């Protein structure tokens, strides 16, 4: 399969690595010439500095990965779909539901697939708990607690689009949209939301919150609390999801949902989980579990053999919708 990369920042390095294992990286594009040139040289790809030029000249591409700033995902995805190329869009799908709908419409009109990266779904503990829920082993789920306690220091936001309302969108979009995705994937849609937001440690650096608390009520009656911050001192502390059910309690914990921290389930024990991948490393900070290998394996198997896809655009939209509702329920900072 023939791939292109739109955006050559840090996450693009991860994409390029796995594209090379699943096909051929034909072209890369970034408005910063040096970034495009370095990645192109490493993978013997053509370098472009304008997406329109790339789409005009590269006529035999199968898939393009969109790795540009959040606020540009929609325009870049739509242009690529209209050029007749399947799209794999980094998270978040976009930063408004309207943009997500426009992306899906472009996909349908072009007859090309639109995928959204949802790498946390491939974490071994996450998949184990999803099986528990699908098999009904927890019985009725009563409530949940989602904790996202990470660190993003001032250097992370310097000389960058990160922290901008227009291009970043908010802490839930950039840091924690994968966690919100898991709530929808495991428990369904949200009915009611009430949130409190604040910016304590990043005043003058970012245009939105660095801390938030949200109370959630799901359509199926489950209630839950989301507690998140990027003010954990010096390093990431915790990324965890705890479910309280009729027949059991289970906590996926660690820094990035990478282990089972607690379980007490009637007549069942989660055991012998594979170790999983490490976290994505971005210089001085860490991200979620590095599962882009599984993202690309899933994408290729879907396109070649019609196997089930874990990364549908409609589910990407639902993540953005839930985040929009959290932000709408509180006064933005």
Where are these regions (language model features)?
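Hydrophobic residues in well-ordered beta-strands that form the structural core
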Residues: 49, 89, 114-116, 226, ...
């Amino acid at each position: 399969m023939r791939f292109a990369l739109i955006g050559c920042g840090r996450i693009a390095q991860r994409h390029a690595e796995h594209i090379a294992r699943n096909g051929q990286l034909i072209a890369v594009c970034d408005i910063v010439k040096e970034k495009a040139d370095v990645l192109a040289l490493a993978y013997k790809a053509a370098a472009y500095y304008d997406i329109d030029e790339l789409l005009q000249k590269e006529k035999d591409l199968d898939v393009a990965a969109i790795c540009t700033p959040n606020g540009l995902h929609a325009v870049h995805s739509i242009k690529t779909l209209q050029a007749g190329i399947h799209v794999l869009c980094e998270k978040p799908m976009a930063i408004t539901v309207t943009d997500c709908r426009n992306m899906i419409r472009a996909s349908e009109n072009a007859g090309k697939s639109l995928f959204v990266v949802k790498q946390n779904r491939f974490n071994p503990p996450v998949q184990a708990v999803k099986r528990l829920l699908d098999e009904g082993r927890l019985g009725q789920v009563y409530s949940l607690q989602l904790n996202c306690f990470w660190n993003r220091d001032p250097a992370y936001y310097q000389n960058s689009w990160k922290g901008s309302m227009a291009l970043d969108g908010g802490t839930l979009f950039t840091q924690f949209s994968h966690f919100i995705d898991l709530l929808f994937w495991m428990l369904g849609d949200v009915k009611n939301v009430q949130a409190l937001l604040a910016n304590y440690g990043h005043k003058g650096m970012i245009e939105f919150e660095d801390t938030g608390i949200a109370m959630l009520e799901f359509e199926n009656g489950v209630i839950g609390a989301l507690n998140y911050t990027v003010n954990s001192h010096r390093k990431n502390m915790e990324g965890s999801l705890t479910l309280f059910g009729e027949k059991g309690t289970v906590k996926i914990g660690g820094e990035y949902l990478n282990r089972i921290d607690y379980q007490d389930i009637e007549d069942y024990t989660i055991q012998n989980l594979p170790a999983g991948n490490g976290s994505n490393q971005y210089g001085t900070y860490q991200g979620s579990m590095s599962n882009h290998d599984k993202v690309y394996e899933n994408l290729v198997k879907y396109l070649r053999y019609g196997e089930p896809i874990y990364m549908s655009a409609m589910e990407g939209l639902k993540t953005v919708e839930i985040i929009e509702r959290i932000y709408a329920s509180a006064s933005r900072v």
